[in-house]
Amino acid sequence: MSTMIEVRDLTFAYPAQEEEQQQGTVALRNVDLTIEKGSFVAVLGHNGSGKSTLAKHMNAVLLPSGGRVFVAGMDTLDEQQIIAIRRAVGMVFQNPDNQIVANVVEEDVAFGLENLGVPSADIRRRVDEALAAVGMEEFTRHAPHLLSGGQKQRIAIAGIIAMAPQCIVLDEATAMLDPAGRREVLATIQTLHRDMGITVVLITHHMDEAILADRVVVMNEGSVAMDGTPTEVFTRVEELEEMGLTVPDTVQLLHRLRAAGYDVPLDALDVEACADAVFGALN
């Protein structure tokens, strides 16, 4: 795989809020991270761990105080590359209402393309394809404000897809959704990754969401504390708990069964695999 995003010794401090403060809050400290094209990476951490600050560096919403961030080989500190960087990496944020800019779904999805001066025929095709990709093609003429939270986030994702990015970063994109909305958005993300080969970076505090990824990065106090497959990360239960993180229910169950003497695999992380493992151990 080739590199999509490369973070080199990244340090970032938010500006001081008061004049008497000499230094701002340091949110990231010497972070090194490489994300390969076509991968699905979940970034976990409690509030204040630096995960959202890291996400905002991935398409130059924030710029490094120290170190470098490269997106598809482009340095985010190079002002001439900012537009190309933001076209390469699209971002979906936490509040779906803050991302709606039009009164009709298809117009909202077309907004970015129109600003780029894309020909009308191409806009029509790309909007239709993007809405189909997120399963919202039947809502073309609907008013976005009448949609559910999950549907609004899927519209936001469609607007990003229409711009043909190489990577999508979702910064706590399911945090304000009900369980049904979360399932809708997560299913959409999985489809885009599997069928379109889009690189996905999922910033989340929901452990069960991270199970879906190929790789899990855990942030703590502005640094990378863990980096590995979901199985590698979630078997380090005590370390995660020390960082204020609770492992998925499936992991807790498997560890309790193992402690009770049952021969269950610790890598059966999703609900279906866990159920099969428990059934097999008890029979």
Residue positions per predicted region:
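Conserved ABC ATPase "signature" region
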Residues: 121-139
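Conserved ABC ATPase signature
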Residues: 143-147, 151
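Catalytic Walker B motif of ABC-type/P-loop ATPase nucleotide-binding domains
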Residues: 168-171
